[in-house]
UniProtKB/Swiss-Prot annotation:
Origin species: Aspergillus oryzae (strain ATCC 42149 / RIB 40)
Top EC class for this record: isomerase
UniProt keyword annotation of rRNA-binding present: no
Protein name: FK506-binding protein 1
Activity regulation as described: Inhibited by both FK506 and rapamycin.
Entry GO terms, CC: cytoplasm
Gene assigned in the entry: fpr1
Length: 116
């Protein structure tokens, strides 16, 4: 349970610490185990790369985002792109959040662009 990180592209910089302001590009999907073996991530629910959007800027490790992001992003290095698979207890738990049903496993492709 928790967060599993799979590196797509290795970074070459430092990792953020709790309280650091980070800039992140991300795309999020609701995991669908019935279709996972066909290379399907799930149903996309959000992306910072959508037209008119930009990177998310947030203080990491401060509970401003879901626990899976706080833990997963702090394991990344600057410039890294990774897939984070986040179980419900590290996501939104038993509560629905917008387009995300309760008890959903989430998949995020996350790119750590900047650490301030």
């Amino acid at each position: 349970m928790g967060v599993e990180r799979k590196i797509i592209t290795r970074g070459s910089g430092p990792s953020p610490a709790s309280g650091d302001k980070v800039s992140i590009h991300y795309t999020g999907w609701i995991y669908d185990p019935k279709k996972a073996n066909k290379g399907f991530q799930g149903k996309q629910f959000d992306s910072s790369r959508s037209p008119g959007r930009g990177p998310l800027v947030v203080n990491i490790g401060q509970g401003k985002v879901i626990k899976g992001w706080d833990e997963g992003v702090m394991q990344m290095s600057l410039g890294e792109k990774s897939t984070l698979t986040i179980t419900p207890d590290y996501g939104y738990g038993d509560k629905a959040a917008g387009k995300i049903p309760a008890n959903s496993t989430l998949i995020f492709e996350v790119e750590l662009l900047k650490i301030n």
